Amino acid sequence: MEGNRDEAEKCVEIAREALNAGNREKAQRFLQKAEKLYPLPSARALLEIIMKNGSTAGNSPHCRKPSGSGDQSKPNCTKDSTSGSGEGGKGYTKDQVDGVLSINKCKNYYEVLGVTKDAGDEDLKKAYRKLALKFHPDKNHAPGATDAFKKIGNAYAVLSNPEKRKQYDLTGNEEQACNHQNNGRFNFHRGCEADITPEDLFNIFFGGGFPSGSVHSFSNGRAGYSQQHQHRHSGHEREEERGDGGFSVFIQLMPIIVLILVSLLSQLMVSNPPYSLYPRSGTGQTIKMQTENLGVVYYVNKDFKNEYKGMLLQKVEKSVEEDYVTNIRNNCWKERQQKTDMQYAAKVYRDDRLRRKADALSMDNCKELERLTSLYKGG
């Protein structure tokens, strides 16, 4: 069972990397796999948030600047650290400072998000999107911005979960929830924390935005989680991708393979007609013949007379005449269209030369069509 837990944790890590890269489908696939291996709370929490809010991922790409935050945080709260200077080392405005202080002074999660206690899912999503972008430590360098960002993430993660929201409402405020964490009813807070990290939640909403090489560590009560915005490919992931990649390539090539097979089969099944309206040395159809009814000329090979006699010959000659009439009719239509176009152009541009040229068109195919029509009527 412990072996399954290790594999499940690997799947969760791969899912988090996928979220950082904005690949929600891959993250969801690995989280579902982790759930089958071992029931990790973090996997369940991530999966629930993705299923509820994943459709928004990837719609709001953002560019992250390398963060140098290293603010000293409160016990059991967010710690955002890199090898650079602290949050105060970068520029920030008075409005950002006031906003951070306002968030950190809030006593309950409803105040944090600025919503009422009867707020629905859409209200929570709207409030979270607005605040998460405003207080993300890579955009807001005011002291305490990391704590505020974490608090906003925890607020949404708890209030968007019906069960956790119901139990949270029993405590009245955040501090009471923290004080009651040893009580079995409130152990879902894990020391005032949700089962999903603030950065994971942000990546689900914004499709792995703010890509960079910076590292953010968020403490979730009993254990910390470090995210590196770089591609870390494990052997487990590569093996999974190879399997999926091979199958997906096969699926993509399937229509082409089917098309080739159908083309080959049709060539094998459909034989060349025993005649041609024009001499074709490649097929040996060079012997000239003429239909008995309309006198249409066609060409056959040397074995034709031995193979086609009587009724068979009549069927062939009927097909010859039908093909010939169809060709003549099409060519006549083209001739008429050409003549009409030339006459119209001559009228528009008042060009007598073009008008005379249009009148001089021979219309050979139309004359032949008239001859064939008279033969049909006469027959």
Swiss-Prot record:
InterPro entries in alphabetical order: DnaJ_domain, DnaJ_domain_CS, DnaJ_subfamily_B/C, DUF1977_DnaJ-like, J_dom_sf
Domain J: start-end pairs: 108-172
Ranges where the record places region Disordered: 55-94, 219-241
CDD domains with a match to the protein in the record: DnaJ
Protein's membrane topology: Single-pass membrane protein
A Gene Ontology BP annotation from the UniProt entry: chaperone cofactor-dependent protein refolding
Keyword annotations from UniProtKB, A to Z: Chaperone, Endoplasmic reticulum, Host-virus interaction, Membrane, Nucleus, Transmembrane, Transmembrane helix
Lumenal compartment residues: 266-379
Effect annotated for changing H136Q: Abolishes interaction with HSPA8/Hsc70
Classification via SUPFAM superfamilies: Chaperone J-domain
SMART domains: DnaJ (SM00271)
Subcellular location, record wording: Endoplasmic reticulum membrane; Nucleus membrane
Pfam families in alphabetical order: DnaJ, DUF1977
Alphabetized GO MF terms: Hsp70 protein binding
TM region(s), chain numbering: 245-265
GO cellular component, one term: endoplasmic reticulum
Cytoplasmic face of the membrane: 1-244
Biased composition (Polar residues): 69-84
Subunit description: Interacts (via J domain) with HSPA8/Hsc70. Forms a multiprotein complex, at least composed of DNAJB12, DNAJB14, HSPA8/Hsc70 and SGTA; interaction with DNAJB14 and HSPA8/Hsc70 is direct.
Similarity field: Belongs to the DnaJ family. DNAJB12/DNAJB14 subfamily.
Name of the protein in its database record: DnaJ homolog subfamily B member 14
Gene name of the record: DNAJB14
